[in-house]
Swiss-Prot record:
Biased composition (Acidic residues): 124-148
Bias (Basic and acidic residues): 220-230
Protein name: Protein Brevis radix-like 1
Organism: Oryza sativa subsp. japonica
Membership in a protein family: Belongs to the BRX family.
Gene: BRXL1
Length: 397
């Protein structure tokens, strides 16, 4: 076989056949073998076999993949589209080639086609199915992908994720901004966006469209009670709490915040409301019961402080008879009968507000504990309550 291949190479190069070169009688056997190779039918078969072996060797070594004429012909041939999702070609491409896929963002020229070395059109397995689904869902009327608005996410800094849309005419559109609750609260997120708005718009080539970009909203929580806006908690020792904050009680009675460090402060709650005197000792925030003709809205205080409702059941207790005299420290004028229930709020420490109810007979009940969202996270609030539960019961009940 090797003699035949060498014979075919010499014949192809224009050299005289081995039959003419071997004139000696000692080389008779070699001459007979060369004479057999020199027949036209055998010569064509050898050439075809040699070409097939070379073709197989080149395909196995991957030389066709880096051949420029082959790459140009494969990208420009009409059969390239049919080979796009062919299972053989998808299997033939190695896994490393798939990572050379260049993400073509819109705005890079819809008519320009990247070279094969820059991107590959072959995907294998689940990636091919995902691409087909994206084509069916997001393709335009003419079926091209270059005009689609593609969505992508950038992490500007830890805890800040911005979702962009790549526009067909170039540039990006701002779709969504997300902040991590572990790093940002609402005010920190708004302040960050106000300071970095121009940088983000310039860095990511965001098209403004002559519109004012709104401030980002606070990331939503799964708990519906935490979706309300949360204003900053005002200091109780320097500012007067708004008298429009009320909470509805049973029997049509409501309670309102009293002014700290005041003796006999009188205010009007609006049309149909009765006037009420709040007599509070220094350092105490008091509630006074009052009859109202109309019930105020609860949304004004629904987000003032985070309320840990899971603690309510464990916090209810009654005081001992020795502590009955402590309830007389608060002198609250009641508009109805003298045996009505009373509620007031104590600030145990900055950001911790304890609501206490005085029941008929001098019994006190711990209604709830509220924590300021600016000072306590949910986990921090639970840990604080576990550590201070006994002290709160001893101190206030």
């Amino acid at each position: 076989m090797l003699t035949c291949i060498a014979c075919s190479k010499q014949l192809a190069g224009g050299a005289p056949p081995l039959r003419e070169q071997s004139d000696d009688a000692d080389d008779a056997a070699v001459a007979r073998g060369a004479g057999e190779c020199a027949t036209p039918s055998t010569r064509q078969a050898i050439k075809a076999l040699t070409a097939q072996i070379k073709d197989m060797a080149l395909k196995a070594s991957g030389a066709y993949r880096h051949c420029k004429p082959c790459a140009g012909s494969s990208s420009s041939s009409p059969a390239a589209g049919a080979r796009r999702h062919h299972p053989y070609h998808a299997y033939a491409d190695s896994g490393s080639d798939r990572f050379h896929y260049a993400y073509r963002r819109a705005g890079s020229g819809g008519d320009a086609t990247p070279s094969v070395s820059a991107r590959t059109d072959f995907l294998a397995g689940d990636e091919e199915e995902e691409e087909e689904e994206e084509e069916e869902e997001g393709t335009t009327a003419d079926g091209s992908e270059d005009d689609e608005a593609k969505e992508w996410v950038a992490q500007v800094e830890p805890g800040v994720l911005i979702t962009f849309l790549s526009l067909p005419e170039g540039g990006n559109d701002l779709k969504r901004i997300r902040f991590s609750r572990e790093i940002f609260n609402k005010w920190q997120a708004q302040r960050w966006w106000a300071e970095n708005y121009e940088k983000v718009m310039e860095l990511y080539n965001v098209q403004r469209f002559n519109q004012q970009t709104p401030l980002p909203t606070t990331p939503k929580s799964e708990d519906e009670s935490l979706k309300e806006d949360i204003p900053a908690t005002p200091p109780l020792n320097s500012e007067r709490l708004p008298h429009t904050l009320h909470r509805s009680l049973t029997g049509g009675r409501t309670t309102g915040y009293g002014q700290p460090d005041s003796l006999g402060h009188q205010h009007n709650l609006g049309n149909g409301h009765r006037q009420q005197h709040h007599h509070c000792y220094t350092g105490h925030q008091c509630y006074g019961s009052v009859g109202l003709a109309s019930t105020p809205k609860l949304s004004s205080i629904s987000g003032a402080k985070t309320e840990t409702s899971s603690m309510d059941a464990s916090m209810r207790s009654s005081s001992s008879p020795e502590e009955v005299d402590r309830s007389r420290e608060l002198s609250v004028s009641v508009s109805n009968a003298s045996d009505q229930e009373r509620e007031w709020v104590e600030e145990d420490e900055p950001g911790v507000y304890i609501t206490i109810r005085a029941l008929p007979g001098g019994i006190r009940e711990l209604r709830r504990v509220r924590f300021s969202r600016e000072k306590f996270s949910e986990m921090h609030a639970r840990l604080w309550w576990e550590e201070n539960r006994a002290r709160i019961h001893d101190q206030y009940l």
